[in-house]
Amino acid sequence: MAEFETIIGLEVHAQLNTESKIFSTSATKFGSPPNSQTNPVCLGLPGALPVLNESALEKAIMAGIAFGCDISLFTKFDRKNYFYPDLPKGYQISQFDKPICTGGGVTFTIKGEESSRYVRLTRIHMEEDAGKLIHSADPNIPQSYVDLNRAGTPLIEIVSEPDMRSSDEAYYYLNSLKSILKYIRVSDCNMEEGSLRCDANVSIRPKGSDKFGTRVEIKNLNSFKAVKAAIDYEVEWQTEMALEGKTFQQQTKLWDSVANKTVTMRTKEMSHDYRYFPDPDLPVIILQKETVESVRSKLPELPNERKNRFVEKLGLPKYDAEVLTAEREIADYFEDALKVSGDAKKTSNWVKDEVLGVVNKESITISEFSVSAQRIGGLVKLIADGKISGKIAKTVFEELLISDKDAETIVTEKNLIVVRDDKEIERIVNEAIANNQDAVAKYKSGKDRALGAIVGYVMKVSKGKADPELVNQMLLDKLGSLPPKE
């Protein structure tokens, strides 16, 4: 049986989160009534001239810098000509041979692997989005409606080299790309709202061959899971075709998420089919190096850089660092809490386990979480300073969720400070030993885990307020002085 190698390249369209459209002053707010965010430019009315949105240009440059691209100091816009109901001008303003960014790449790590992988980028170019067709849900009314609110929304198209060899690589590449775009805040990357869309180019070839096979472009991929599933299906289909000695044309397919298969949409057009030519209404763009450096100075610390700092400077485990840097807002929250607590590992545990536990359970973002980073930091500081135990901290956390008080106020009002009175703890320890003779016997016979039952008794009697370290040390001393059980 012949063995084949999968070749994958991805084209990602990311809407830039500007207030207005790329060539007009119309708003870009999602969810507005149909055709309420249009003007003569995005409607393609005669005599309406486009003017480039400077903010869109800056965000495109920032994305290029973040991905390590070369920023073109000379760039221009071109008309991509085709006819479709959601394109009122009969052409799309895009970039053909002089994109704003070239080269660069995306580094990512597949879950469970130690080493990272790198996928090269071909280019990043700017273009305007098309409108949206809304099809009638009633099969007896074969009508489609056009909403041009989205027409003219600024996009960057991020085109990768065909460097990926599996759907897993594509999946984690997309996760890393999305994380970077959100970190630098040029796009909200909300796939449900269509602000991040992906097309996959898939082909196979015999292993060892350096020639590319016939390529299929897959569209209608509205989630990363859909990208993975579509690639897996397409690779299986192409492999079956090859094994049966059949050929097929280069084509565009749609992903049918109901049937879980790719469906042919049309034979693939080549670039000459679009009759690209420079847009005569838009002047060429000549950037100054100072402009690029000004944008570079605004670039925040990127996810991989931040993750490495958390591991190398703060001493966090790699897993913790990956969780905390998955989103910029989470990493910011952690660092703000750390400024108060002073203990990186304890703060990490509380943010990734307790805070994100609530965030995920309630399906909210961390910016919507009711407890500020400073209040969580205050709670962790009480733990780090030995003023409260982990068990008491959970009680305080529950109170933080429903009140505006800080942790120290809650601990004081509820008298939850850890008990360090030697005589009081010794009294409870003696009681625990006397009332847990079975556990004492097991411990003395070498079953160290039996100590937990005795400690649990002490914590129950003290209502969780006894100093755990003092309890453990006192128990070990007292049990060590007892004769071993026969």
UniProtKB/Swiss-Prot annotation:
It catalyses: L-glutamyl-tRNA(Gln) + L-glutamine + ATP + H2O = L-glutaminyl-tRNA(Gln) + L-glutamate + ADP + phosphate + H(+); L-aspartyl-tRNA(Asn) + L-glutamine + ATP + H2O = L-asparaginyl-tRNA(Asn) + L-glutamate + ADP + phosphate + 2 H(+). Coiled coil: none annotated. SUPFAM superfamilies: GatB/YqeY motif, Glutamine synthetase/guanido kinase. GO terms for biological process: glutaminyl-tRNAGln biosynthesis via transamidation; translation. It comes from the Bacteria. GO terms for molecular function: asparaginyl-tRNA synthase (glutamine-hydrolyzing) activity; ATP binding; glutaminyl-tRNA synthase (glutamine-hydrolyzing) activity. Transmembrane segments: none annotated. Its EC number is 6.3.5.-. Pfam families: GatB_N, GatB_Yqey. Keywords: ATP-binding, Ligase, Nucleotide-binding, Protein biosynthesis. Allows the formation of correctly charged Asn-tRNA(Asn) or Gln-tRNA(Gln) through the transamidation of misacylated Asp-tRNA(Asn) or Glu-tRNA(Gln) in organisms which lack either or both of asparaginyl-tRNA or glutaminyl-tRNA synthetases. The reaction takes place in the presence of glutamine and ATP through an activated phospho-Asp-tRNA(Asn) or phospho-Glu-tRNA(Gln). PANTHER family: GLUTAMYL-TRNA GLN AMIDOTRANSFERASE SUBUNIT B MITOCHONDRIAL AND PROKARYOTIC PET112-RELATED, GLUTAMYL-TRNA(GLN) AMIDOTRANSFERASE SUBUNIT B, MITOCHONDRIAL. Belongs to the GatB/GatE family. GatB subfamily. Heterotrimer of A, B and C subunits. HAMAP family: GatB. NCBIfam families: gatB (TIGR00133), PRK05477.1-2 (NF004012), PRK05477.1-4 (NF004014). This is Aspartyl/glutamyl-tRNA(Asn/Gln) amidotransferase subunit B. It comes from Leptospira borgpetersenii serovar Hardjo-bovis (strain L550).
